[in-house]
């Protein structure tokens, strides 16, 4: 509960970020070190949204079924899709954040909030996963889907 309280309090939706300490906009070309940091912040932002989704769903968190927390979390998912994690977007930084870290946390949040995520939004979120993790990249890896 305390972590979610802090995340919700600190959340400031702005171009290129959901939290001031987690700016994820693409860095200047050639700045490979900063690209890795910023791609990690995409994953970090989705992990924070997942934490908020857990708190919304779990009993006794102090945030269980809190409509304002739900609204904030859904706005965060929409912002991430509009700003950075969307089909057709070019990647930067570390492949792990685009192919594993971010989509795993985002999909966890969507499962937790499934009945509240509009179908059109969910379709866009999953299209982004399909874009960054195309079948051709995982078809030769048994047990991976």
What residue ranges belong to the model's regions?
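Aromatic-lined, polymer-binding surfaces characteristic
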Residues: 4, 8-145
């Amino acid at each position: 509960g305390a972590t979610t309280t802090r995340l919700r309090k600190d959340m400031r939706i702005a171009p290129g970020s959901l939290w001031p300490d987690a700016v994820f906009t693409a860095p200047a070309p050639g700045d490979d070190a900063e690209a890795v940091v910023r791609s990690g912040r995409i994953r970090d932002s989705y992990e924070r949204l997942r934490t908020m989704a857990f708190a919304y769903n779990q009993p006794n968190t102090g945030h269980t079924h809190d409509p304002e927390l739900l609204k904030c979390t859904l706005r965060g998912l929409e912002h991430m899709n509009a700003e950075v994690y969307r089909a057709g977007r070019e990647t930067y930084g570390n492949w792990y954040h685009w192919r594993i870290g971010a989509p795993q946390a985002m999909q966890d949040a969507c499962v937790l909030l499934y009945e509240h995520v509009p179908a059109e939004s969910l379709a866009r979120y999953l299209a982004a996963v399909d874009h960054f993790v195309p079948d051709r990249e995982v078809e030769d890896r048994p047990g991976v889907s």
